[in-house]
Amino acid sequence: MKLLVLCIFAMMATLAMSRRWHYVPPKFLNKAFEVALKVQIIAGFDRTLVKWLRTHGGTLSHVQKKALYFVNRRYMQTHWANYMLWINKKTDALGRTPVVGDYTRLGAEIGRRIDMDYFYNFLKGRNMIPKYLPYMEEINRMRSADIPVKYMGK
């Protein structure tokens, strides 16, 4: 029982520190900046997926490959707020007002640096590629720029 309480307190402390000690109001992005980020992040993830499919995707069905493209988009949506924390640090360090090219460069860096190969191998190796459902088709059909994210631009 004591161990359970200790684990719960440790988890609460971890969550509190991951959210910072004080409230950090979100910075809203200009729509052009948001689009530049999304397009470059998805392009990087998709480029990685194409390379991975060329070497490891021979045994996957067409539907499973489409599900992996959905995984790319959902991964970006899930981690968008964390990307924004990193991007805010990088743009603040510029010492000037950021432009679309800065956000394009940062989005490309995120798309290139995140090791999605490991994630694809994990999903394939454990037979955990999600079943392809209609809502996945909707998101896959969207342009990269139109994929909804929680940290919305104006």
Swiss-Prot record:
On whether Signal is a keyword of this UniProt record, the answer is yes
Return the GO cellular component terms, semicolon-separated: acrosomal lumen
Q: Does the keyword Signal apply?
A: yes
Q: Specify the superkingdom.
A: Eukaryota
Q: Which CDD domains match?
A: Lysin-Sp18 (cd00243)
List, in alphabetical order, the GO biological process terms annotated in this UniProt record.
single fertilization
According to UniProt, the tissues expressing it are described as:
Sperm.
Renumbered to this chain, the signal peptide range is: 1-18
**UniProtKB keywords:** Fertilization, Signal
Output the Pfam families linked to this UniProt entry.
Egg_lysin
What task does this protein carry out? Dissolves the egg vitelline layer nonenzymatically during fertilization. It creates a hole of about 3 mu-m in diameter through which the sperm pass.
Subunit organization: Homodimer.
Protein name stated in the entry: Egg-lysin
